[in-house]
């Protein structure tokens, strides 16, 4: 305690004025100027922002001088992040090439040298700029060929009556990989990357050859379109038809094949649609019945706490009840362990205040 009191007293102004007052410096008061210039023991930390050779290294101005107030002196306390700083840390300087523009170095006021590019990076840039002229000519020739082929593909497709989606489906039939309509559209518009255009071109060339030679390609395309439409189609049942199916399910949850066909004819649905609906409805009923059985078992088990309800009185003092209702202020809780006889809580008188509107 004595050490703490001494340290606090050393850094607080005296009650009778500053060190320059008529009373002179007192033994418990340390002048801020002396505190700011304290160097500390050799090899130990210095105190204050003005310690060491130049505070410009940290990019902050030195601490302002003390300000005069009425009857005393205020000092500049230690700032955030500038507390006890080792002397060795003040002597560290930034390495060359890392100092930013406009930051002066500490050695003779010389400005840092600008960052130089490594020779490896320059070499790579030169290699990129100095491309082989023969390769560039080949790439340009390939681009022209791709443009001409894209125009030919579009003309052939429109002439034969194929859509872009049909071209993608027939590519799947012929080569086992279906392409989307967006891909064919982007190929014709030359919006794909150069690599993807080169990969897709041989497949489309084979499609053009098949379209010219194979007369059944249109029929194959239509059949594949129907198959894809069946895969993508999602069954939607009207509310009226769904209500009729619910009534039939209540009468017969598991109909036979003949009954399913009869129901499909009456409601205008496919047999598979009716069969799948009844299967899904039975599964839904099983899930709901299992949930109901679990709920009944939980309710039959009762409360997880042993013992009956115990009433605990509230803390003594006035309690405001709901206006118009004179109910006792007790909270019903369940105790995990029943209280033995003779250890019940003593009765506490509770004053219940009525509603302010009906009070006399």
Curated annotation (Swiss-Prot):
One of its GO terms (molecular function) is transcription cis-regulatory region binding. GO terms for biological process: anatomical structure morphogenesis; blastocyst development; BMP signaling pathway; cardiac cell fate determination; cell fate commitment involved in formation of primary germ layer; endodermal cell fate specification; endodermal-mesodermal cell signaling; heart induction. Gene3D superfamilies: Homeodomain-like, lambda repressor-like DNA-binding domains. Expressed in developing brain. Highest levels found in specific cell layers of the cortex, the olfactory bulb, the hippocampus and the cerebellum. Low levels of expression in adult tissues. DNA binds at residues 157, 164. Pfam families: Homeodomain, Pou. SMART domains: HOX, POU. Interacts with PKM. Interacts with WWP2. Interacts with UBE2I and ZSCAN10. Interacts with PCGF1. Interacts with ESRRB; recruits ESRRB near the POU5F1-SOX2 element in the NANOG proximal promoter; the interaction is DNA independent. Interacts with ZNF322. Interacts with MAPK8 and MAPK9; the interaction allows MAPK8 and MAPK9 to phosphorylate POU5F1 on Ser-355. Interacts (when phosphorylated on Ser-355) with FBXW8. Interacts with FBXW4. Interacts with SOX2 and SOX15; binds synergistically with either SOX2 or SOX15 to DNA. Interacts with DDX56. Belongs to the POU transcription factor family. Class-5 subfamily. This is POU domain, class 5, transcription factor 1. The lineage of its organism: Eukaryota, Metazoa, Chordata, Craniata, Vertebrata. The gene is POU5F1.
